Amino acid sequence: DIVHMATYAPLFAHVDGWQWRPDLIWYDNLRSVRSCSYYVQQMYAHNTGTHVLKATENGKPLAGNEGQDGLFASAVWDAAKKEVIVKVVNVSEKAQEVKLNFAGLKKSQKPQLVDITTYHSDDLYADNTLDNPTAIVPQVQTADGAALDVANVPAKTFAMYRFKVEGRK
């Protein structure tokens, strides 16, 4: 999950002449639009963290080729911002609950939810277009600093949870 440099190819695609999908930015002679792939790459690139944390369910990683029941997850610690960032992808057809347990923290280091960013579409093949450039964009919901023990991740959603943890190095 920590990527110091990333290259994504193909980057640009003209709407009247392209070789393959997905491309990050589509354009014609006058306009451009960010694709769904662009926003996913942006969410990862802007939330890399400094240390990778374990993300498991029932002791098994929520990663790899299989995930668990359509769930895939990663977690990182950002030492500069003093935040834990949890990213969860639910590729299944149903909403799923994810239990969040921050092992290894002192009781005084209760994680405070900062915000939740969700990226969702009911249609797996939908994308932004030149005529509708904001059909699918990340939605950010700020939080009041409350604790969050269980996250409800809708079907076909990429969700990112940022938690402030004071007193951790």
Question: How would you describe each model-predicted region?
Answer:
Residues 82-90:
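Short, well-ordered beta-strand segments enriched in hydrophobic/aromatic residues
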Residues 56-70, 89-169:
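C-terminal beta-sandwich/jelly-roll accessory domains of carbohydrate-active enzymes
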Residues 1-75, 80-82:
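Aromatic/acidic polysaccharide-binding cleft in carbohydrate-active enzymes
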Residues 6, 41, 86, 116, ...:
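Conserved, mostly hydrophobic/aromatic
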